[in-house]
Amino acid sequence: MPMHFLLRYELSPDYLARRGEHRDAHLSLAWAAADREELVLGGVVGDPVEEALLLFRTREAAEAFAAADPYVTSGIVTGWRILPWRTVVGEDAAEPVRPA
């Protein structure tokens, strides 16, 4: 069954204070994944920031991204998990479903 995969990041309480040191490397990794059409969207959630979500086309791409992400390896991401997401509405839906 076609799906997208959400990479969900739990962030350290001092995420905003610490991210600057690793931000360029993180964004380079993210844009490279987007250029390969693996990463659809990504960013932080909340104001103030609560967590981050990144939407991938495959579980493997999400796993590889998390393993290489400087935010993860530096510890400012304190936990992560990948959630399968059966997208059914929108131009980029993995499995578009229209009303009968």
Identify what each model region corresponds to.
Residues 1-100:
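Conserved, structured core segments of small domains
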